[in-house]
From Swiss-Prot:
GO cellular component: anchoring junction; apical plasma membrane; basolateral plasma membrane; cytoplasm
Keyword Glycoprotein belongs to the record: no
Gene this protein is translated from: dstyk
Protein name (database record): Dual serine/threonine and tyrosine protein kinase
Annotated ranges, domain Protein kinase: 645-899
SUPFAM superfamilies cross-referenced by the UniProt entry: Protein kinase-like (PK-like)
EC number: 2.7.12.1
Record's keyword terms, sorted: ATP-binding, Cell junction, Cell membrane, Cytoplasm, Developmental protein, Kinase, Membrane, Nucleotide-binding, Serine/threonine-protein kinase, Transferase, Tyrosine-protein kinase
């Protein structure tokens, strides 16, 4: 064979080459996406680990951030699968019943008689004992020159004189294929024959022909194909059935490589090919029945004469083993089988990668919502806590200042009602730890003091309990109206700022201050401030009672001691003392609370600054970058699965892309294709986020379905990259529909459809921001669907950019601070067109000569005029929707039933007179 020049290529080889070329091209993109994903995750981990290391004063903030983004990584099993799959080299593995079958199939693949067949092949593999075939493994690779060499697998080339190198050859010499019996060199016996050819198929994939079983067991021969290889396993069959040894080998292949097998039935030299074809068409061959019975072939609903499945497998379906019964039609089964195996691996890898992108992107978006809420709610909570504490302090001080006289009267009343009972209880008091004689003989001075102390304690306990119960009722209402709310708000602030043990002590101290100063639990058991002050004051007064001579301990004496103690109490002084000390402690607690709250606020301020910085990074960098990776992985999956869509005629042009007709793609027919060429990274990021928001939305009948996306790297001759968004094709847009004419009932139904679609978007946390006539599409029944979610974003991901169509833009859009009420405003303008029944601009907008003038007029309050044909209720609804104050615009949950009632009133039977003005005049 000539050492230079490309090999001839058969139609089978050309189609296989195209399949492998497509696989390798997509593999490059998949590897790039995986590499960038790894780099992104690595950068995220480094950034947040550095943030944690530097945030020594705010371990809570750092732990919050790391907790939020700890799942920004590959699960171990997914990482292992991607490592083994992405970038795996395609290999055609040629197995067979014997060497003759394998060689015949290899020659068919390459379209040339490279390996010897027939008599020149020599001894068959199933020769008699003593004549066992010993042909080595063959590896076909690509090279500019044709050459043969012996090499140890994965190691080095052996210096050995091959017969092929001694002269010209067309077929590989038989002696180079075999291991001679006299060869005793173990390296030479283990070596494989590497055949380098300048063949298009070998440029895209390597080919390996397994050796004879006597040379190397099948499990050892396939050992190198278990890692980073995608094998296309072909099994050549040249007899009607398989031997038990061959079935066992196939089971081993199935265990080693979890890939399907294509069984190729080779023509039998002893039977005419026409006769063989007729036999295949009549019934399943003996081979196919054997493979089915041994579990080596999946059950098939029906095959054509070539052995290929009668029905094409669904896109993305797991490939199954197949049998090619007709060698003349091998092309019809082998090429689809190869494509399906290659496609399945790439689709699975791209889907797994895209699933990871979407999970992490959803995490970023959810965290953006949480951070935005934290930034909004924490300052309000702090202000609310300060305000409510001030109200509580003022209320308690009012009680201390104004309730003194009430306390005095309450104490006098309590003493008066309890006096006789107290005296009786004191007279009957049994002293503890003191022995008193029955005749009341005098005792020592020390025992007298103990008796007096016990009588005092009795009076103090009874009075304290009675007065405390009445004090509680005077301030008890504060507990629920102030303290309960304060505690809940404070608890939420503390939970969002648990930083360290030191800061826990501060938070606990703040709680203790509230419990001690403001709960006003003046029961005896709690030992609260007011009760304790009252008790101490009583003790001080009673202790001033003196006794000169030790008296006899009699009931009369006990009664006298109790009487003197009660009469010594001054209700006025006691009330004044209680209120004075209560005020002092209130003020002290108020100051301590305020200081602690300021300290907590300072810490929250630092945390919120870090949160806002992180929120900006998520919105501006992290989420857009990840969205772009997600768009690329999803588009790669779609193009592998469904191919590149074919562009039809142009349907329309917009600010950011061109819309084409697409007859069929991915099982959808017909489709619309939006071609977008992002000019810079910002537009790329916006488009990627749009695609993510749209694709992750559940299907809804009022939204246009997005079927998929494909990134066209060959756009404009490869100078630009275009993103092709394939979506549902509808009949026309609302602008065209209004120009053609729509009935009143159709227009009101369209209004209801649009409101339903916007409500669904809002329920998913999204704003459309560009509701207008061109973005509402109509089907053949004139039912509406919202399209073009190019400006659609969650509130938490909005950066305040000014987007939309000027006529439909709410005034607050120009300030950059807005919410989902901008869609209500835009609907109000859209509803004006629907009620007008035409596309003529309102007078207020028609006279504007430029976009800037139009914006200025909208900001100044310019709105569409009322047309004579407008129904009063419709006009009121429009005005409410485009109200300049966003808070005054109605919720869509109110707009929808209003529209329904308008529709029922104006379109039902008997309402022709009411609706005739709208129907006829506009």
């Amino acid at each position: 064979m000539e050492g230079h020049g490309a090999q001839r290529s058969s139609p089978l080889a050309r189609d296989l080459t195209r399949a492998f070329t497509s696989y390798n091209k997509h593999t490059v993109l998949l590897k790039k996406n995986l590499k960038e994903t790894h780099a992104f995750f690595r950068e995220m981990r480094q950034n947040y680990s550095n943030t944690c290391a530097s945030s020594t004063l705010s371990s809570d903030s750092s732990s919050q951030e790391t907790g939020q983004f700890s799942c920004i990584s590959f699960p171990s099993h997914e990482e292992e699968f991607l490592r083994n799959t992405v970038g795996a080299a395609p290999y055609i593995l040629v197995l067979g019943q014997d060497c003759a079958a394998r060689y015949q199939l290899l020659n068919c693949l390459l379209g040339d008689r490279l390996l010897p067949l027939g008599p020149e092949a020599g001894q068959a593999c199933h020769g008699g004992q003593g004549n066992v075939c010993k042909r080595r493994k063959l590896c076909f690779t690509h090279g500019r020159q044709t050459r043969l060499s012996l090499a140890l697998p994965g190691q080095y080339e052996l210096v050995h004189q091959l017969a092929a190198n001694c002269g010209r050859w067309e077929t590989v010499p038989r002696e180079d294929l075999e291991i001679l019996d006299e060869c005793e060199d173990p390296a030479h016996r283990q070596a494989e024959l590497e055949i380098t050819l300048h063949h298009p198929l070998l440029q895209e994939a390597k080919v390996m022909v397994v050796p004879c079983p006597s040379v190397q067991p099948i499990e050892e021969a396939l050992e190198d194909c278990t890692r980073s290889v995608i094998p296309i396993i072909l099994y050549a069959v040249n007899r009607d059935s398989l031997s038990s040894e061959q079935v066992a080998d196939l089971r081993k292949v199935k265990e080693i490589l979890s890939f399907p097998v294509c069984y190729v039935r080779l023509p039998d030299a002893s039977a005419a090919s026409a006769e063989l074809g007729q036999r295949c068409e009549k019934d399943k061959s003996k081979l196919q029945k054997q493979l089915l019975s041994r579990g080596l072939l999946g059950s098939l609903s029906g095959n054509c004469s070539c052995g290929a499945p009668a029905q094409t497998a669904a896109p993305g379906a797991k490939p199954q083993s197949v049998v090619g019964e007709n060698f003349e039609k091998l092309h019809r089964i082998l090429v689809p089988f190869t494509r399906q195996v290659l496609q399945n691996q790439q689709v699975e890898a791209a889907s797994l990668l895209n699933g990871l992108h979407c999970r992490c992107l959803d995490l970023f978006i959810n965290q953006a919502f949480d951070m935005q809420r934290d930034l909004q709610i924490t300052p309000r909570r702090l202000e609310y806590t300060r305000e409510k504490e001030g109200e509580l302090f003022t209320s308690l001080m009012t009680i201390a200042n104004r309730k003194q006289e009430e306390m005095k009267d309450m104490i006098v009343e309590t003493l008066g009602s309890m006096k006789e009972q107290l005296l009786e209880d004191a007279a009957n008091l049994e002293f503890t730890d003191i022995i008193v004689t029955t005749n009341g003989d005098p005792v020592t001075s020390k025992e007298i003091k103990s008796c007096i102390q016990q009588i005092q304690d009795l009076i103090v306990v009874r009075l304290n309990q009675a007065v405390a119960n009445k004090l509680i009722s005077s301030v008890d209402y504060l507990r629920e109206s102030f303290v309960g709310t304060l505690e809940r708000c404070l608890s939420s602030l503390e939970k969002s700022h648990i930083e360290s043990s030191v800061h826990n002590i501060t938070s606990n101290h703040l709680k203790q201050l509230l419990n001690a100063a403001y709960h006003v639990e003046v029961t005896f058991h709690s030992g609260s401030s007011v009760t304790r002050l009252f008790w101490e004051q009583i003790k001080q007064i009673i202790h001033r009672i003196t006794f000169v001579n030790p008296p006899a301990i009699t009931p009369e004496w006990k009664r006298k001691v109790a009487q003197d103690a009660i009469e010594s109490l001054s209700a006025a002084k006691l009330a004044r003392s209680i209120c004075s000390q209560f005020r002092t402690r209130l003020y002290s607690s108020h100051e301590a609370f305020a200081a602690s709250l300021r300290q907590l606020e300072e810490r929250h301020t630092g945390r919120l600054e870090r949160t806002e910085d992180l929120w900006l990074r998520v919105r501006k960098d992290h989420a857009p970058r990840l969205a772009r990776l997600s768009l690329e992985s999803r588009s790669l999956r779609d193009v592998v699965l469904h191919g590149k869509p074919k562009l039809g005629r142009e349907l329309g042009r917009g600010q950011y892309g061109v819309v084409y007709l697409c007859d069929s793609w991915g099982g959808h027919n017909p489709c619309a294709l939006k071609s977008v060429v992002p000019p810079d990274d910002k537009h790329w990021n916006d488009l990627a986020l749009e695609f993510h928001y749209t694709r992750t939305l559940p299907k809804h009948e009022r939204l246009v379905d997005l079927h998929g996306s494909v990134i066209d790297h060959t756009y404009a001759g490869g100078s630009s990259i275009a993103v092709l968004l394939i979506m549902e094709r509808l009949h026309r847009d609302l602008y065209t529909g209004l120009k053609a004419g729509l009935s009143l009932q159709e227009r009101l139904q369209i209004a209801l459809d649009v409101v339903e679609g916007i409500r669904f978007l809002h329920s998913q946390g999204l704003l459309h921001r560009d509701i207008k006539l061109k973005n509402v599409l109509l089907d053949k029944q004139n039912r509406a669907k919202i399209t073009d979610l190019g400006f659609c974003k969650p509130e938490a991901m909005m950066s305040g950019s000014i987007v939309g169509t000027p006529i439909h833009m709410a005034p607050e859009l120009f300030t950059g601070k807005y919410d989902n009420s901008v869609d209500v405003y835009a609907f109000g303008i859209l509803f004006w067109y629907l009620c007008a029944g035409s596309v003529k601009l309102p007078e207020a907008f028609e006279k504007c000569s430029s976009k800037d003038q139009l914006w200025n007029n909208v900001r100044k309050g310019a709105r569409p005029e009322r047309l004579p044909c407008f129904d009063e209720e419709c006009w009121q609804l429009m005005e409410a929707c485009w109200n300049g104050d966003p808070s005054q615009r109605p919720l869509l949950g109110i707009v929808e039933p209003s529209l329904e009632s308008i529709t029922v009133r104006m379109c039902n039977c008997g309402s022709e007179q009411k609706s005739s003005s709208l129907e006829d005049s506009c």
